[in-house]
């Protein structure tokens, strides 16, 4: 089975707003709702699960009202939460495919999600990480946290439902939609100008 796991339990302190980051709004729509709508337009994702934590109780209530299944995590750090999620899935099956996507990536549409999954299956590897060139960030006036050899990791990864180090392939996509990871108010300001370009129906 192919799952989307939306990572929605981070603290989001850099955004410097009283609102939990997944519920921060672009054009009166929460970031996580953009992500969920995009996942729902995917032809390959079969089920969506939201990973929440004590850091984001209002986000948990929001997605529960939308009838999504919740997976509680400690919310201490990404890798710790990831391991816990993989363990949870591994108990049921070691053959599931899990697409992890951060709740602050509003512009990654279903067709892009499907492209990433198709490249993952084509690779024959257990895991796939998605990266975009630094030049995409620079052209948009967006900041990034980390780069290696001119590439920046995007918050979209694919893994098998096994809690172990997995043989990974890297997918480089030169699409500006993937660069909009809303971490700061500056990111949100830039994203605000592009909302209608990437989301015709808000």
What are these regions, as identified by a protein language model?
Residues 1-17, 23:
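N-terminal nucleotide-binding beta1-loop-alpha1 segment
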Residues 21-35:
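Short catalytic helix/loop segments, enriched in acidic residues and glycine
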Residues 24, 69-71, 180:
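Structural signal for short hydrophobic segments within the conserved structured cores
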Residues 31-97, 110-111, 151:
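Conserved N-terminal catalytic core of the sugar/cofactor nucleotidyltransferase
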Residues 99-101:
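Short aromatic-hydrophobic micro-motifs that form the base-stacking/packing surface
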Residues 103-105:
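Short acidic donor-binding/metal-coordinating loop in glycosyltransferase active sites
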Residues 108-193:
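Conserved core of the sugar-phosphate nucleotidyltransferase
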Residues 191-202:
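C-terminal catalytic/acceptor-binding lobe
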């Amino acid at each position: 089975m192919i799952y989307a796991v939306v990572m929605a339990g981070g603290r989001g302190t850099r955004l410097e707003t009283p609102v939990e980051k997944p519920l921060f709004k672009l054009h009166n729509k929460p970031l996580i709702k953009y992500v969920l709508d995009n996942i729902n337009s995917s032809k390959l994702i079969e089920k969506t699960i939201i990973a929440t934590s004590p850091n984001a109780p209002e986000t948990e209530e929001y997605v529960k009202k939308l009838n999504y299944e919740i997976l509680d995590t400690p919310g201490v750090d990404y890798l710790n939460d990831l391991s816990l999620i993989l363990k949870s899935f591994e108990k049921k099956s070691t053959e599931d495919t899990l697409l992890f996507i951060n709740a602050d990536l509003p512009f990654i549409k279903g067709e892009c999600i499907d492209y990433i999954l198709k490249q993952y299956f084509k690779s024959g590897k257990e895991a796939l990480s998605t990266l975009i060139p630094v030049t995409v960030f620079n052209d948009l006036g967006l900041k990034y946290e980390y780069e290696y050899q001119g590439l920046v990791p995007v918050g979209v990864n694919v893994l098998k439902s096994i809690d172990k180090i997995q043989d990974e392939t890297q997918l480089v996509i030169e699409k500006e939609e993937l660069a909009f990871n809303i971490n700061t108010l500056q990111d949100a300001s830039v994203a605000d100008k592009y909302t209608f370009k990437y989301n015709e129906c808000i």
